[in-house]
From Swiss-Prot:
Purpose: Allows the formation of correctly charged Asn-tRNA(Asn) or Gln-tRNA(Gln) through the transamidation of misacylated Asp-tRNA(Asn) or Glu-tRNA(Gln) in organisms which lack either or both of asparaginyl-tRNA or glutaminyl-tRNA synthetases. The reaction takes place in the presence of glutamine and ATP through an activated phospho-Asp-tRNA(Asn) or phospho-Glu-tRNA(Gln).
Protein's name according to its UniProt entry: Aspartyl/glutamyl-tRNA(Asn/Gln) amidotransferase subunit B
Domain of life: Bacteria
Quaternary structure annotation from Swiss-Prot or TrEMBL: Heterotrimer of A, B and C subunits.
UniProt-recorded Gene Ontology molecular function terms: asparaginyl-tRNA synthase (glutamine-hydrolyzing) activity; ATP binding; glutaminyl-tRNA synthase (glutamine-hydrolyzing) activity
InterPro entries tied to this protein: Asn/Gln-tRNA_amidoTrfase_suB/E, Asn/Gln-tRNA_Trfase_suB/E_cat, Asn/Gln_amidotransferase, Asn/Gln_tRNA_amidoTrase-B-like, GatB, GatB_Yqey_C_2, Gln-tRNA_amidoTrfase_suB_CS, Gln_synth/guanido_kin_cat_dom
EC number in record: 6.3.5.-
Length: 497
């Protein structure tokens, strides 16, 4: 059925949105949550498995202590309370990627609860309250062969890779986020971006959205404006980029309003996000907790972190996001607007790494929020997924600072980086992009431009130095952009003085 979408402004005139975000973070432990199998990404299918993570009879699980430590550190960084005693539970359901027919998770006794994170959107601070952060194991990965979409519907057959089954996860669940109004999509994106940066700073995960090591489920509902109630929610599963988080919230708000305006009820269901078309489609009816028949995991002992251990881990935390933003803004000399734009674009960490690699703060910001953001938008990916690294961008800027490139030539170097042609220096050499430093060649090009534009030359002789721009353009064209515009201007004014 074709969905009826309501214009975003019209949605806000009639409804209040409420969001809930569930973010799954794969921890970078060396072994899985309940067994000793390795967790290396990209291994051959079904080569990192054992009787425990395959759910074979008689195999007994053992809790990964490093995963518990990482969970506590995440909880502390999110201002959560840490449970003095918690235990695992079996979440029972059947699906091919869950070989045990249950997932070992936590239910009513999570390890972390009652936290918050403050996020900034356009100068306005929103407090996102954390309901819980609990430990669980990841599922396997299904591959549906055949069909137009790669989904199970219409597939010829399906394959399952159990390498991912049992990898430690932390699921971070927010309370309903209300009051964001028109900024709801941006708040959702900002929260996931800031959470991702925090996870990376903690060193507990690489938080690669493109590889699925951090994934977001977006819950959304609409209620009549100013009613103070919560509507029926839908859950959009496995949204795998910051851009998609924002787009999914915006789309679901428009879709919900279309359904409600038509007098139909919202179905409580899970939905699939399609990055290529920017729409969601129905998945399955959303289950409630009782449908999973949770009960305590009998094969695992409870987890009881001591207060001394928790306080020891608290001492390992990096500075919180608010403190870090204030410090970096002061160090970099960014205005409030420049800092908000950097944070809002999810580029704070990548700009920081580029500066650390040798670029100036303004140059790092210029490239990532300008050129790289434009290319990422055209490709439909995040800037961090382009394949250009902070070290690459810093090196390009160093070449600009040394007078070996200008901005136009630098963009051609980025073309080469995206095409996989090597390092910036290798691309400059292979493409012959370096700025011409031969004074004789520059002087000859200036003489040629003056001879070809006598009227412009006369204006400059009469003191109208602004006219030099036309001659500079002519020289740059002749030199194919491989000249220092400032030096060309100097030569023109010297010759016409």
């Amino acid at each position: 059925m074709t969905e009826t979408l309501v214009a975003f402004d019209d949605v806000l005139a009639s409804y209040d949105p409420a969001m809930g975000l569930e973010v799954h973070v794969e921890l970078n432990t060396a072994s899985k949550m309940f067994c000793g199998c390795p967790t290396e990404f990209g291994a051959e299918p079904n080569t990192q498995v054992c009787p425990t993570c395959l759910g074979l009879p008689g195999a007994m699980p053992v809790v990964n202590g490093k995963a518990v430590e990482s969970a506590i550190r995440i909880g502390l960084a999110l201002n959560c309370e840490i449970a003095e005693w918690c235990r695992f539970a079996r979440k029972n359901y059947f699906y091919p990627d869950m070989p045990k027919n249950f997932q070992t998770s936590q239910y009513d006794e999570p390890i972390c609860f009652e936290g918050y994170m403050d996020v900034d959107v356009d100068g306005e601070t929103f407090r996102v309250e954390i309901e819980r952060a609990h430990m669980e194991e990841d599922t396997g990965k299904s591959l549906h062969v055949g069909g137009a979409t790669g989904r199970i519907h219409g597939a010829d057959h399906s394959l399952v890779d159990y390498n991912r089954a049992g990898i430690p996860l932390i699921e971070i669940v927010t309370k309903p986020i209300v009051g964001a109004g028109a900024k709801a999509p941006e708040v959702a994106r900002a929260y996931v971006a800031q959470l991702r940066d925090l996870i990376i700073a903690l060193g507990v995960s690489d938080a690669r959205m493109d590889q699925g090591s951090i994934r977001a489920d977006v819950n959304l509902s609409l209620s009549p404006k100013d009613s103070g109630t919560l509507g029926t929610r839908t859950e959009t599963k496995n949204v795998n980029s910051l851009r998609s988080v924002e787009r999914a919230v915006r789309y679901e708000m428009s879709r919900h309003a279309g359904v409600l305006d038509a007098g139909r009820p919202i179905l409580q269901e899970t939905r699939h996000w399609h990055e290529d078309t920017g729409v969601t489609t129905s998945g399955r009816e959303k289950s409630d907790a009782e449908d999973y028949r949770y009960f305590p995991e009998p094969d695992l002992v409870p987890v009881a972190p001591t207060r001394a251990w928790v306080e020891e881990l608290r001492g390992t935390l990096p500075e919180n996001p608010t403190q870090k933003r204030a410090r970096l803004q002061a160090e970099w000399g960014f205005s409030d607007l420049e800092m908000r734009d950097t944070v809002g674009a999810g580029a704070l960490l990548i700009v920081e790494e580029t500066i650390a690699a040798g670029a100036s703060p303004q140059a790092a910001r210029k490239w990532w929020l300008g050129e790289m953001a434009r290319r990422a938008n055209e490709a439909g990916v995040e800037v961090g997924e382009l394949g250009v690294t902070p070290v690459d961008v810093a090196r390009v800027q160093v070449l600009v600072d040394e007078g070996k490139l200008n901005d136009k030539l630098a963009r051609q170097v980025f073309d080469g980086l995206l095409a996989g042609e090597g390092s910036p220096d290798e691309i400059v050499a292979a493409r012959g992009l370096a700025i011409v430093s031969d004074e004789g060649a520059l002087s000859a090009a200036v003489d040629s431009a003056i001879a070809a534009n006598p009227d412009v030359a006369d204006k400059i002789r009469d003191g109208k130095v602004a006219a030099a721009g036309a001659l500079i353009g002519a020289v740059m064209k002749e030199m194919r952009g491989q000249a220092d515009a400032a030096r060309v201007r100097e030569l023109i004014l010297e010759k016409l003085a």
